[in-house]
């Protein structure tokens, strides 16, 4: 059944401050990561680190996600706008976060924290990797609630009508449905069954399922057994790269522009290195040690 997206992206207001669902999804993701990470710490999955140490790590990882995600979006998807108006970097309430930028930010934060703790960086990355998909899933749900990052037009019965989406897939930059008629008229047309040809793939939900639920289950089960260094990180990079590359085929490209061949998107270009890195990390894991967990009472940091 075709669904008309009519969800208010604002969860509630505190005086002049409007709290968006997308921000709450970020908080839910970080909260879930803390709960799951605490469980792994108690199982001794990060040698020599206790819950206080993990809380410290998570704080810096959160900073890496937010700062890296915003800077990455400006560099990868809105560089021209950033050059025209550098202050756009700080207008986070207008939206615009990049997974690949957030990933770089997290890796930099983990590298700094690992160096300070005198730990191997990839022991920490392997520990964190199973915690990330939950946040990715919540983030994609936030994208769906916000009615952004929609998919291409579809004739499938589960399509979603996004009033903010363009009226067709090409050309880029044309008017959205809400620019032509008001929302009351949109609801009337929807009830009369006149908007079916404007339905789009709910690509945000596809990503929430693949990058969130599926990746979490696979990585969580895979990491329950001690694995060689690099193995969990490699599996994360490989799965995300493949899933993101595939979903991009039914997702509208950022800014409505394909990078090459009339079908290749910037998201696919940024995901290809992750696939290569994932395979390389698997190769490294074949010649790396397996670190056995240390029970929580024995940890010191």
From Swiss-Prot:
Residues that, per the record, bind a 1,2-diacyl-sn-glycero-3-phospho-(1'-sn-glycerol): 140
A Pfam family that the UniProt record links to this protein: LGT
GO molecular function, one term: phosphatidylglycerol-prolipoprotein diacylglyceryl transferase activity
InterPro entries recorded: Lgt
Membrane topology: Multi-pass membrane protein
Cited function: Catalyzes the transfer of the diacylglyceryl group from phosphatidylglycerol to the sulfhydryl group of the N-terminal cysteine of a prolipoprotein, the first step in the formation of mature lipoproteins.
Family statement: Belongs to the Lgt family.
Protein name: Phosphatidylglycerol--prolipoprotein diacylglyceryl transferase
Biological source species: Xylella fastidiosa (strain Temecula1 / ATCC 700964)
């Amino acid at each position: 059944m075709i669904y008309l997206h009519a969800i208010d992206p604002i969860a509630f207001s505190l005086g002049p401050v409007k709290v968006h669902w997308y921000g709450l999804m970020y908080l839910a993701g970080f909260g879930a990561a803390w709960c799951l990470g605490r469980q792994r710490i108690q199982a001794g999955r990060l040698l020599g680190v206790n819950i206080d140490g993990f809380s410290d790590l998570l704080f810096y990882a959160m900073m890496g996600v937010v700062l890296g995600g915003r800077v990455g979006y400006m560099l990868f998807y809105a560089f021209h706008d950033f050059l025209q108006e550098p202050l756009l970097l700080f207008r986070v309430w207008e939206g615009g976060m990049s997974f690949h930028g957030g990933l770089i930010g997290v890796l930099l934060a983990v590298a700094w924290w690992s160096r300070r703790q005198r730990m191997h960086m990839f022991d920490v990355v392997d520990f964190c990797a199973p915690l990330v998909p939950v946040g990715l899933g919540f983030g994609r749900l936030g994208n769906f609630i916000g009615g952004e990052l929609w998919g291409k037009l579809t004739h499938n019965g589960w399509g979603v009508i996004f009033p903010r989406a363009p009226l067709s897939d090409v050309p880029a930059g044309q008017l959205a449905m809400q620019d032509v008629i008001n929302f009351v008229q949109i609801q009337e047309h929807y009830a009369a069954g006149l908007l079916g040809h404007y339905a789009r793939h709910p690509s945000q939900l596809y990503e929430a399922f693949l990058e969130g639920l599926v990746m979490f289950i696979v990585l969580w089960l895979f990491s329950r057994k001690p694995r060689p260094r690099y193995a969990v990180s490699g599996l994360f990079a490989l799965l995300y790269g493949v899933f993101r590359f595939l979903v991009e085929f039914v997702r509208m490209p950022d800014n409505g522009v394909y990078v090459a061949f009339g079908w290749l998107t910037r998201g696919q270009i940024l995901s290809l290195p992750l696939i290569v890195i994932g395979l390389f990390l698997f190769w490294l894991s074949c010649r790396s040690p397996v670190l056995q967990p240390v029970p929580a009472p024995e940890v010191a940091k």
